Amino acid sequence: MMSLRSAISAGLLVLCCSVPAVAADAWVAEWDMPNGLAELRQGNFKNIFMFAAYFDRQDRPYLTEDMQKALRGGLAASLAQSPNKGPGVYLSVVNDLLVEAPGKSIQKDPGIVSRLMATEASRAAHRKDLLALLSVYPFTGLEIDYERVNIDDWPRLLQFAQELSVTLAAQGKKLRVVLEPKQKYLQGSLPAGPQYVVMAYNLHGNHNGPGAKADDAFLRKLAQWCAHWPVKPGLALSAGGYAWTARGVVDLTERKAAAWAQGAGVQPIRDPASHALYFKAADNSPGSPLLAKGGTTGGSCEIWYADGETLASWAELGRSLGFGDVSLWRLGGNTPESLAKISGK
């Protein structure tokens, strides 16, 4: 992909600019609730996924104080002011162990899933806990975002999801399951009942070198892995991007990346293979988000990120490949122009 950077042509740029806006769902993260709710008021999103409920030491899901506060007031106010007055609201549950003790929290803990799926009794107890969480707010449904699942637990988790979807359907609610972009999870069959959404990102990130979160080849590979499913999965796209620096990889929102480019006096280039934007800038240039962290030396950084044209291009290709609804990870840090393109406003 690096060798294709200089191959952008005027025709490709015209094509990117002509990509239509698409209607989408979106996540609002509890650690960036004010910004997420503010963007909710700007976009015409179909469904909102409140991220997230975490797990305590007893493998019980719970809501943080910030999430509870949002559900008590901030969310309702934002929904009332959004262009779409009736978006559905889902609660997303993630297998993160979140405790107050330093160094004790674990993200995407497969052990939690193993213990919850181990026996019929443990699955029944977990189902009861999830249903109890849904009672704190008139949610449209529930989302299960369990990642790094041990492959031996995968069949039991799918069975659990199918049974839970039946229970929720009887209550007039829906279940959605998030699937990682890994062949071991996507190559098998999926039970009818739940909705499914595939994470179409993490092609590049803090685990490897510079590049876009997704590209056309990556999306086509995911479509091939999902082609045998009787259900049409949704497609989750990720906004923002990363900066590769001498001190590691730094997560960036679109706003931060664009401000960095502007401060450095650099015009980002659109990569034809991924439709993402990229540029290079010093870590201490004006607009750099690294200045606030200190320790900058003037070293060169490579930045890749998605804007509205990127997201709309991915969404258009995804739908042409057979994917269903698009979901945006996440609200907070996006420009109004990008929100308009991805929310269908």
Where are these regions (language model features)?
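Substrate-binding surface in catalytic domains of secreted glycosidases
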Residues: 57-70, 154-268
